[in-house]
Amino acid sequence: MLNLVALSLGIEDEALAQIGSSSGYEYVTKWGTQGEGPGQFDGQNDVVPIEESFVIVPDYDNHRLQKFSDNGTFIATIGTSGELEGEFDNPHSVDVDSDGNIYVSDKDNHRIQKFSSEGDFITAFGSEGTGDGQFTHLHGIAVDPVRDFVYATDTENYDIQKFSTDGTFLKSWGSEGEADGQFSSLESVDVDSQGNVYVADYGNDRIQKFDGEGNFILKWGTPGSADGQFDGPAGVAVDSNDNVYITDVNNHRIQKFSSTGSFISAFGNEGEADGQFVQPEGLDVDSEGNIYVADTGNFRIQVFSQ
């Protein structure tokens, strides 16, 4: 997807030092600054690469999506502030299905919007409330492209909801608490090749894993800053080998785990240099293993190879 050889020629020794020479990751590129113009951000909480094509970033407080080439060249803006079809009130998370259609958690409009890969509005579903198919604080979203399911997390309803890709409500699970299958301040969600669902249980500093029907499988993580510990896990991304990547927000780093929760590696620390982060929230991994990180506090996207 990325021309990593060409891009990596510009990598500075400082960037490699920030990542760590033994981490197995290399800084590739970055883009974005704070602002309202094209290619600028105000609260980018997620990022998703669409294979061999482009990258979509929800620009939260600018109430829009931005579309870039895979090396960060600005292409287009999708949406404006509002409540109508194709408009947003704090779009938080984004994912795509196997056809390249884009799904957006339109948080303060309490709905999910679906667009074509070109940004044309297709449909919307959801409303404000606590019932089936309703949202109070819609947050993360993930599409299972093999089985055509959409999963969404709700921070204040403490649940995960499952839909078909046309917006039909299928089921939900979860409640407030610390027990298995309970949550405290839900963040992102993603799905592996087997249809298992991984959720960032931010307030409990852990990751929980379920099957596609909501049955609890396992959990990992405790509060702290050591390997495998978290201080606010937010973003979740599963790669083609079912490894799980987590943005550890207040530890300003990315951690990588096996599908059973075994710690593999970590990279990043607090700062503004290449390879450093300030409260990174969202991330995704493309088919070649390149990691795209929404470096939220630095108002930029960073890309790494491994």
Give the location of each predicted region.
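Conserved beta-propeller blade signature
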Residues: 54-56, 101-103, 149-151, 196-198, ...
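Short loop/turn segments immediately following the C-termini of beta-strands
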Residues: 60, 107, 155, 202, ...
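Gly/Pro-rich loop segments of beta-rich domains
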Residues: 20-45, 73-92, 121-139, 169-187, ...
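Short loop/turn segments that connect beta-strands within beta-propeller blades
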Residues: 69-73, 116-120, 164-168, 211-215, ...
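A short loop-to-beta-strand structural motif that recurs across blades of beta-propeller domains
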Residues: 63-66, 110-114, 158-161, 205-209, ...
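Residue-level detector of Asp-centered blade-edge/turn motifs that repeat once per structural unit
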Residues: 49-52, 96-99, 143-147, 191-194, ...
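Beta-strand-rich domains and repeat architectures in extracellular enzymes and scaffolds
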Residues: 36-53, 57-60
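Blade-level signature of beta-propeller repeat domains, shared across WD40, Kelch, NHL, RCC1
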Residues: 279-306
